[in-house]
Amino acid sequence: QEQIARSLGEGHRVIRGVAGSGKTLILAFRAEYLARAATRPVLILCYANGIAGRLEDAMQNRGVEDRVQVLTFHSWCYRMLRTYGIPAPSPREYPDYAERLAASVSEVVKAVDQGHIPMAQYDAALIDEAHDFEPQWLALAARMVNPRTKALMVVYDDIQAIYKGRERPVWSQ
């Protein structure tokens, strides 16, 4: 997996594999490889807290935790809002948790569109569990990648998708 991660070349990459095929391990090795050469942070986004925690541990074990940010997508959205002084949707406004999460994503997209949150903050963005991401989330993550590096990596397995009813991304976009 480490050799594959180093030999992926430049630009955007989409990796599809079945459960247990080593997708997350390849992603971790790739993040380390990119982080060692990066001038800006590397971002890893996941859907679930458990995988985010394991990837965060992996980055610490590899000594690149100061160059790699590992977050769930929604935690990253809240961090962006907090970092740039934009009020996050509150439980009072959105008592339903899922609606509050969706509103946080909308606020980040709006803030990026309006220039309140800068694009291209990361030399690379790597997305694990992309089968559980909505197309809008992937598009937002892609906007955060430095256009010079074009280093967006997405790993997925449609069979593992938690939310089967979600709109599926068109990977060529």
What are these regions (language model features)?
Residues 3-6, 12-84, 124-173:
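Conserved helicase motor core of SF1/SF2 NTP-dependent helicases
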Residues 84-121, 129, 133-143:
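Conserved RecA-like ASCE ATPase "motif II neighborhood" in helicase/translocase motors
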